[in-house]
Swiss-Prot record:
Bidirectionally degrades single-stranded DNA into large acid-insoluble oligonucleotides, which are then degraded further into small acid-soluble oligonucleotides. One of its GO terms (molecular function) is exodeoxyribonuclease VII activity. The gene is xseB. Heterooligomer composed of large and small subunits. Residues 1-22 are annotated as: Disordered. NCBIfam families: PRK00977.1-1, PRK00977.1-4, xseB. This is Exodeoxyribonuclease 7 small subunit. It is found in: Cytoplasm. It comes from Photorhabdus laumondii subsp. laumondii (strain DSM 15139 / CIP 105565 / TT01) (Photorhabdus luminescens subsp. laumondii). Pfam families: Exonuc_VII_S (PF02609). Keywords: Cytoplasm, Exonuclease, Hydrolase, Nuclease.
Length: 92
């Protein structure tokens, strides 16, 4: 039986049937999709399909980042011994 390409399998999966992907693998797939879309070489239907998959991946990534941020906040709030201040990327 021929082996299928992992990326083509994941692009045809629905969110309900898709195997759990790491944040990094989702980001890598999203970057590949963006590159293919930017190349302008895809047929309309394939481009639309890739765009839909990209939106799914972007939403999954956003959710993963929000969950990570919540976990960090919980961990920081559990430490009552040290005073904390909000992080600002402009302040170093």
């Amino acid at each position: 039986m021929p082996k299928k390409n992992a990326i083509s399998e994941s692009t045809n999966s629905t969110p309900e049937t898709a195997p759990a992907m790491t944040f990094e693998s989702s980001l890598k797939e999203l970057e590949q999709i963006v590159a293919r879309l930017e190349s302008g070489e895809l047929a309309l239907e394939e481009a639309l399909s890739k765009f839909e998959r990209g939106i799914q991946l972007a939403r999954q990534g956003q959710q993963t980042l929000q969950q990570a941020e919540q976990r960090v906040q919980i961990l920081l709030n559990d430490d009552t011994q040290s005073p904390l201040s909000h992080f600002s990327p402009d302040t170093e």
